[in-house]
Amino acid sequence: MDLKQIAGEYAATFVKDGMKIGLGTGSTAYWTIQKLGQRVKEGLSIQAVPTSKETEALAQQLNIPLISLNDVQSLDLTIDGADEIDSNLQLIKGGGGALLREKIVASSSKELIIIVDESKVVTRLGTFPLPIEIIPFAWKQTESKIQSLGCQTTLRLKNNETFITDNNNMIIDCIFPNHIPTPSDLHKRLKMITGVVETGLFVNMTSKAIIGTKNGIQEL
């Protein structure tokens, strides 16, 4: 079985009857959602908030009841993937382009469980390009200010056209030559740039990490 599938399906066991949950986006969260769809079919009663249009479509296909985050005060649990995770449970997310909604849903949850395969575990964040969601207006000005923090930037494309997020924004992917020694500081500096909507740095948000390894499940 695929390591992502092992981690994703295991994470679904943390969802209990009556919970309001956040559904992540990406290839690992896909397996959690599939497993939850199976459990709903077997009688599990939950309500879910999707973190992307892609996840919303999958949940509807599996008959998982969906709600709006506007209609609840908080969620019991969110299960989502990550592009990188370190030993302090700091993350880079946004490889799939859903980082803003993922962060809103995660920050509205009492608990955030991150599911990854062992290839995503790193000693220091930053080998994977850091996604930054920006507004389209004057985007080159915003990109220039991001570059002034010492990174190489690339405007994200899809099918040779500018990638547009579910929120009608753009994404700049950033590589920092010396990785990211202090993610919380970098996040704050990026958020101070006018035009930056959100960063893919998730700091002090993760409750638990479930890692699919060749030797089975590992929890951090």
Swiss-Prot record:
Enzyme class: isomerase
CDD domains xrefs: RPI_A
Swiss-Prot/TrEMBL catalytic activity: aldehydo-D-ribose 5-phosphate = D-ribulose 5-phosphate
UniProt GO MF annotations: ribose-5-phosphate isomerase activity
InterPro entries from the UniProt entry: NagB/RpiA_transferase-like, Ribose-5P_isomerase, Ribose5P_isomerase_typA_subgr, Ribose5P_isomerase_type_A
Role according to the record: Catalyzes the reversible conversion of ribose-5-phosphate to ribulose 5-phosphate.
Assembly notes: Homodimer.
HAMAP family listed in its UniProt record: Rib_5P_isom_A
Name the UniProt record assigns to this protein: Ribose-5-phosphate isomerase A
